[in-house]
Amino acid sequence: MSLQLLRNTRIFVSTVKTGHNKTNTQEILVQDDISWGQDSNSTDITVNEAGPRPTRGSKRFNDSLNAAEWSFSTYILPYKDKNTSKQIVPDYMLWHALSSGRAINLEGTTGAHNNATNFMVNFKDNSYHELAMLHIYILTDKTWSYIDSCQINQAEVNVDIEDIGRVTWSGNGNQLIPLDEQPFDPDQIGIDDETYMTIQGSYIKNKLTILKIKDMDTNKSYDIPITGGTFTINNNITYLTPNVMSRVTIPIGSFTGAFELTGSLTAYLNDKSLGSMELYKDLIKTLKVVNRFEIALVLGGEYDDERPAAILVAKQAHVNIPTIETDDVLGTSVEFKAIPSDLDAGDEGYLGFSSKYTRTTINNLIVNGDGATDAVTAITVKSAGNVTTLNRSATLQMSVEVTPSSARNKEVTWAITAGDAATINATGLLRADASKTGAVTVEATAKDGSGVKGTKVITVTAGG
């Protein structure tokens, strides 16, 4: 007799049921919190009658199997693929199945995709009743089992600052099936020794995590060191099971519900400038029904030199009123939910992973959704002929010089932020008032989401 030991478990995911190879099947490096199983439903029939000696027996019938359940954790391990020279993670199939209903296309721009700078995940193509299906193969010692037609229900990044960056995955499948034969050679499909040694330098230290949180209405950025947090992506999957008399039924399929990208943050309550107390006061003071914050968690920190990091971005989040946590050191807890620009936009947020992020590429990722796409870092406002004075009723064309010149989106919005002697339109044409004089401050704000601004003062004179 032999027993199966959990420590000898290996997990594989595949997009196919036959013809397994390294392009359609992937080994997942999991921790010891792995679990899987499938329970059932039954009906008890009892009788209830009067009299001194009633019938008290009962019968039980098996009705159906619930959807098979599974969950496990993986470390976040971005590395450079030796074959493509692009950034990748060992569990990229999971990220794709979480985010898209199409076949995997790492060369694309939605779901899971990559380039030489970073591996990215967005949710712009997740409006499907059925997301990309995976089949999970479980090898424990020499015993194989298989969970058929799985959808990933949830992925949660738990930012425990004493831990290593990891993701907890969970979901369901139609049925858990023991296999009599080996479906493929695990040593041929599994992660090779060279790749395993490569990713040893990719572990991410949560202790270095940075929170970037900015009020999008006031452009006010807060500086809050966190003590913990979560970042959760949920597809709200439900399974459909028939109900046939005299037969045990199994689930026949699954469907997505509302997509949710939510999170929570904890921090000590401090009174420093732009700290957690100031955020608390600002939210209490305004009491907005709807607010808008850009939230980014930078796991692994940001540096001028290249370091492994994971960036979790809620591009437009609604932040709940924080709660006060009473402990030896007073703290605060903040809950948030990412909101799309339109209900069908799929732009709630995105994630980026790289073994070589820098301060610049992290900013690019937060602004553009891709660390390889340059964001605006500075704006110089200019005027035609470089003039600084303008006669009443005259016009002056304003323009900008954007840094870096390689920035993808160089468009700006124009505004007058001080003075009333002139107005400016959407194209940057400044028009002096016919009767007023004085200085006006012309401001240009980058449209790429970076929030970068530039200003120039023009003085309106009576002329001569």
Curated annotation (Swiss-Prot):
Domain of life from the UniProt record: Viruses
One of the record's GO cellular component terms: virus tail, tube
Keywords, ordered alphabetically: Late protein, Viral genome ejection through host cell envelope, Viral long flexible tail ejection system, Viral penetration into host cytoplasm, Viral tail protein, Viral tail tube protein, Virion, Virus entry into host cell
Principal location listed in the UniProt entry: virion
Coiled coil: none
Subcellular location: Virion
Region of interest called Disordered, as start-end residue ranges on this chain: 40-59
Record-annotated BIG2 domain positions: 375-453
Record-linked Pfam families: Big_2
Gene Ontology biological process terms, A to Z: symbiont genome ejection through host cell envelope, long flexible tail mechanism; viral release from host cell by cytolysis
Function: Polymerizes to form the tail tube of the phage. Tail tube protein polymerization takes place around the tape measure protein (TMP-pb2) and is probably directed by chaperone proteins. The tail tube is involved in viral genome delivery during ejection.
Complex and partners: Homotrimer. The tail tube is made of 40 stacked trimeric rings. Interacts with baseplate tube protein p140.
Domain notes: The C-terminus possesses an Ig-like fold of the Big-2 family.
Stated name of the protein: Tail tube protein pb6
Organism in which the protein naturally occurs: Escherichia phage T5
